[in-house]
Amino acid sequence: MTPAKPSVDMEPAYENHPTGANKPRIDAHKVRSQAYSAMLAGAAGHGYGSLDLFWFYKDADGPFPKDGFQHWRKAIAYEGSRQVGLMRRLFEQRPWHKMVPDQSAIALEQGQGTQRLVTARAKDGSFVIAYLAVRLQEVSGVSDWPI
C-alpha cells in the first residue's frame, strides 16, 4: 500500500489452542515466534491470546483440566504470555519505531515457519534485533541481559 499503513497483529495463534485431532496444541514457542516475526517485519504492535483466557473458565466450570483446557488463573501465567511480555520490554528499551525489516543481516538460511530467522535494524544502523531459537542448554557460560 502507498502510503504505508501501520498494522497490528491482533489475532495470532492462541496459546493452548488445539491444532487438530491427535496434534499438539499451540505452545509458547509458536506464540513467541509469531510475536517476533510480526514485530521484526514492521508491525506497530502484537496482541497475545490464550484460548483458556478467551473461555474464561472459573471454579464452577471445573474440574480442570477440562477437555484439555485450564482455569483462567492458570492460563494467565502461561509461558507464552511471559515471553511476549519479555519481548515488549526488549522493544521498549530501544527506539523500535525507528526499525526497518532487514533480512540481509542474516548470514544463514532464513528457514520457514517457527524456524524462520527474522531481523530488523535501526534506520541509522545503531542496533539490530534478530529472532532465532537457541538451545541454551548446549551453550556453556550462558548469561542473560536484564530486560
Q: How does the language model describe each region?
A:
Residues M1-V31:
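Active-site clefts of carbohydrate-active enzymes
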